[in-house]
Curated annotation (Swiss-Prot):
Belongs to the adenylyl cyclase class-4/guanylyl cyclase family. Pyrimidine cyclase subfamily. This is Cytidylate cyclase. The gene is pycC. Mn(2+) 1 binds at residues 84, 128. A ribonucleoside 5'-triphosphate binds at residue 82. Keywords: Antiviral defense, Cytoplasm, Lyase, Manganese, Metal-binding, Nucleotide-binding. It catalyses: CTP = 3',5'-cyclic CMP + diphosphate. One of its GO terms (molecular function) is adenylate cyclase activity. One of its GO terms (cellular component) is cytoplasm.
């Protein structure tokens, strides 16, 4: 991931520079010429994950889908993300209030830009916490959830790299960022106006929005806690999920549930292992290359295209930028960038996860018909996050290196938990 630290370093530094300019007499002139100078970093993130067009939301408060609500109610799904940034108050022990405000604002603003890069809508800033909505009426539910976990993962990466480096340079302890995410389906999220004339807001009423905040509070430091519906909708591989462990009188105790009552039943929570998740991307460098002579995307990379047979065309699918529908024809290609990477043979392997693939006993299989080729064809079939793996062998049939490409598949017809009483 080293190459991508630059994006976050530039994003953070640009926000510091931007807010420093607010106190400069030359700000108005510079702002007219450079008011979008920080946007290229956001655009880099969007392009990296295949996001096209303008960002979804450029405002705070009312979700753009519900500007017209007056005295009515509307039901529509949403994926809620709540992030809390703790530790920035220590800045007040070392700096003047002006400088504390500068750094805290740069941190919050950088977080906002990361969420907006994934089409998140900033609903509310609460001190050092931010409530973000992912999803809108034109977006598939699976893509809203994918956007949320991708944004949350990069937010934690931003903290583990750029922000950690900044705080250590100031001889301060790094920040502790906790993120909670949950999903409420259409019948479980009510949008309406709260308050009185002139003092009101349009917001969501949903236990799943409330639970996002609870999950944040339950998350370990610098981790992401996801609700049961997140996994139910995407069917995330177990290797990217774990049960929170707490010590009780020296004994490890599993904390599986956020709700465990007779009237509401059980609702589970899990830690989303964002480090393992990001480290499994073909398009992102690994966190450590110490034992790797060749690795993606520096030396090689798998790319994927959707084959549109009807129109005799193809479109590139950016890794895990969105979910693919079932029964889509795909073309995978291995691109070699390092001329020193000499190999004798290539083998392709499909690794599926999830209940649907498990039921059909199609979890893993070799693509023998494509042995020796730098490409292979496959079709989407099962809901979940699956991987196409490619292995390169030397003349002695020993593995030189390998790469894997992850893709989400979802028919957006998933059953999720509906808590409480429906109208």
């Amino acid at each position: 991931m080293v190459n991508h630290i630059r994006i976050f370093d530039n994003l953070f530094q640009s926000n510091i520079s931007k807010f420093q300019n607010l106190t400069s007499k030359s700000y108005i002139i510079r702002n007219d010429n450079e008011k979008n100078s920080y946007l290229p970093m956001v655009q880099e993130i969007r392009e990296l994950f295949g996001k096209e067009g303008e960002i979804f939301s450029k405002s705070i408060g009312t979700h753009p889908d519900f500007f017209g609500i007056e005295n009515t109610n509307e039901y529509q799904y949403i994926c809620s993300l709540f992030v809390d940034i703790s530790g920035s108050t220590k800045l007040a022990l070392k700096y003047s209030l002006d400088k504390v405000k500068l750094y805290k604002n740069a941190i919050i603003s950088s977080a906002i830009e990361i969420f907006r890069a994934f089409d998140g809508h900033i609903h509310r800033i609460q001190g050092d916490a931010v409530l973000v909505y992912f999803g809108h009426k034109e977006l598939e539910k699976s893509d809203a959830i994918i956007n949320a976990i991708n944004a949350a993962s990069l937010m934690q990466y931003f903290n583990a790299t750029t922000l950690k480096k900044f705080f250590e340079s100031e001889n301060l302890e790094p920040l502790k960022i906790r993120i909670g995410i949950d999903f409420g389906d259409d019948s479980s999220v009510l949008w309406s106006k709260y308050g009185i004339d002139g003092i009101n807001e349009i917001t969501s009423t949903s236990i799943h929005t409330d639970l996002a905040s609870k999950f944040q509070n339950k998350a370990p430091s610098n981790k992401i806690m996801i609700g049961e519906n997140i996994n139910k909708y995407l069917d995330i591989p177990k290797k990217f999920r774990s049960i929170k462990i707490e010590k009780n009188n020296g004994v490890d105790v599993e904390k599986r549930y956020i709700l465990n009552t007779n009237n509401l039943g059980r609702y589970s929570m899990e830690v989303f292992e964002w480090e393992k998740y990001l480290n499994s991307f073909s398009m992102l460098p690994p966190f450590s290359t110490e034992n790797e002579q060749f690795y993606s995307p520096r030396d090689l990379k798998i790319r994927c295209w959707i084959i549109d047979e009807k129109n005799q065309d193809k479109y590139e699918y950016i890794e895990r930028g969105s979910a693919l529908k079932k029964e889509m024809n795909l073309l995978f290609k291995l691109e070699i960038y390092n001329q020193c990477l000499e190999f004798k043979n290539i083998k392709w392997r499909v690794v599926n996860y999830g209940e649907e693939a498990k039921k059909d006993k199609e979890l893993e299989f070799e693509m023998n018909q494509y042995e020796g080729y730098q490409y292979c064809n496959q079709k989407t079939a099962y809901t979940g996050l699956h991987f196409m793996e490619c292995y390169l062998y030397d003349i002695n049939d020993k593995i030189i290196c390998h790469d894997s490409f992850g893709l989400f598949i979802n028919d957006n017809n998933r059953e999720v938990r509906k808590l409480g009483i429906e109208d």
